[in-house]
Amino acid sequence: MKKILKKPIVHAPVLRRLCYVMLAALMITGVFVIHTSAAEADDLLIGSVSAKYESNGNPATISTGAGDTGGKSYGAYQFASSYDVPYTFAQWCIDSGSDAAIGQQLINAYRADGNTYGAQFDSTWRSIAAAQSQHFLWLQHGYIKAQYYDPTVSQLYSRYGLNVNARSLTLKNAVWSRAVQHGSGGCLNLFAALYAADPSFVSLDDLTIVTRLYEESGAVVNTPPYSNSQPIVKANV
């Protein structure tokens, strides 16, 4: 499975602090100030920390890509262009029936740019976000959930009996964030390391699991090739 996002470099204590700060902000003030159904609002809380820190939850965001192994990145979760995730997202919009019209607009713009992420694609991405901001955010969230979060959650239960759906929002957001950061397979590798160190880790409280998960993630992102990224990239989680 392709990686979604650029790989940041940040030491484990910083990763933990950022996670806790964003979770506290979420609990105190909320992250998304938008009108949704109750079910959508509950679902959007999962992944809100990742989106808040990556882009302030803005579906229109396009990064410059400077100094980033992921290249120019798009949307609330910063889909990495060098891994063709924006194109894969557009195709998913069509194939899943989530919004074929938006998916086709993005693919047409990509082709107009000569199968690259150029001016046409950027303009189309921003215009969709301007016209349908909430809907576009929901599509991006739905793509991450279907392609990365849900498969990770399923495998965690199958392999370790860890029922993430029955655990706290803190743990759900941590799993989402690491699946976004490392891909589903990479996130599962982090949990494999936790299991190797402590086969009974599932019985631990959620905060301890989150702490250990971010420590393992920090060890991964501090190894090449990601350790060669520019400082501006290193600040991302």
Regions flagged by a language model, labelled:
Residues M1-V14:
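N-terminal secretory signal peptides that target proteins for export/translocation
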Residues I9, V21-M22, H35-A38:
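Short, intrinsically disordered, low-complexity terminal segments
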Residues R17-L18, Y143:
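Extracellular interaction modules
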Residues L18-V31:
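Bacterial N-terminal signal peptides
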Residues I28-A41:
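Sec-dependent signal peptide cleavage junction
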Residues A38-L162, T170-V237:
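Cell-wall polysaccharide-cleaving catalytic domain and substrate-binding groove, primarily
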